[in-house]
Amino acid sequence: SMPEPSYTLRAGIAAAFLAAILTALPVRAALPVTGAAATADYWLRAGDDVPLLSAEACAALTHANMQRGLIHDITTAEEFRAGDMVRAQIHAAAQGQDVALPALYESGQPLTEQRWREVCDSRAIEEIGAHVSVRPAVTVRRTDVRLLPSDAGWFSAPHDVRYDALQGTVTDPGEAVLVLHGSRDGRYAFVETRDYCGWVDERALAFTDRETWRGFAAPEEFFTVTTAQLRIAGEEQLLYQLGAKIPGRRSSDGAIHLSLPVRDAGGHLVVRKGRLPDDGRLVEGRLPLTHNNLVRLAFSSLYTEYGWGGANEGMDCSSYVQNIYRAMGVELPRDADMQERVRSLLPLAGLSTAERYERLAQVPPGALLFRPGHVMLYLGRDAGNTPLVIHDISSYYEDGVQQYIRQVVVSTLDFKNS
């Protein structure tokens, strides 16, 4: 028999952000759930568009996450930063991959000590002086953020191509960043974004002055992407993801005019104007945080492909829920372990499984439910009184065998993810 699962219920000021950590339960059903319960219409409530949190409360929650260091307020950044702080950020960004030779594979071969040292050394950490000039820049395309300055994948198995240990996250085009350092060969820039630090391709950046940069970092007028993806044609096609913020305004004829980033030959930012029809993929400002908006946004990405760290033009479990809440004005941390720290913990030890499920009944739809290394969005109970979630899942275990799904699905909580 399996050991009793231990739960914790995460309680906070906002009911919409109640969340629970759930460890493995015995598998009783294969993923995913299909049928009516796997549609947005099943969970929408007629007329239920009352905000669960006001825009002010959403902004306050974002500010609290900044105060706790879970996300970054890059708009208040200084012009110079202590070199020691930048060195510490670079080491932290490596997430342990620079401490000892990891047992990983590159191009199907075991990673060698020489290759590992070469990549770590290319960070040129010893060249960082007492103070570093903080340079504002904007990404000009969807851009990988890497733990070390290399675009070669490091994988835990020789034939793996999906779970790159160096892939941190991705940024949308037009994402304001702070450039703090460069790799020895100049190919990579070490940047701080609103939710991450890491190495990006220097050619994906366009440098600009602070005032122009602020128009991307904190635009007064902007649109939010409400579909899984938005592609904008141009010299280089721009791919934006759910929740992305694009500076722009609406013209008198109802058309949407966007400010799009372009890098000139000298590496500087040129703002290109793009015109799009108002076809429902963009909304002015942020959406209100309501039950129905939560449901619509969550289901906008149903069955889209899972992408570890944003690879394959996809999302992973934590960026999926981050993007949903971002579209409604709440900035959450990027990674699941940091998202868990958004709220305080109330242990539920000593309760039976039935009592814990009863406690789950008090959790509102839209709550984030956590398991080790995984986060899900709670939908509620179906007609058969079974709690269901929607999540971007890579795999689960059935009879000890790992089953890969790699997409956004609706499911029960009766699965093992480790």
State where each predicted segment sits.
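Bacterial N-terminal signal peptides
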Residues: 12-24
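Low-complexity, Gly/Ser/Thr/Pro-rich intrinsically disordered linker/tail segments
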Residues: 32-47, 392, 396, 400-418
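Boundary regions of SH3-family modules and the immediately adjacent low-complexity/disordered segments
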Residues: 30-146, 152, 162, 178, ...
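...with weaker cross-activation on analogous glycine-rich loops/strands in unrelated enzymes
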Residues: 170, 333-400
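Conserved beta-strand/loop element in small beta-rich adapter and peptidoglycan-binding domains
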Residues: 63, 160-183, 235-252
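Second-shell loop/turn segments in exported
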Residues: 161-164, 280-285, 303-312, 356, ...
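Bacterial N-terminal signal peptides that target proteins for export
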Residues: 3-14
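Active-site nucleophilic cysteine motif
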Residues: 308-338
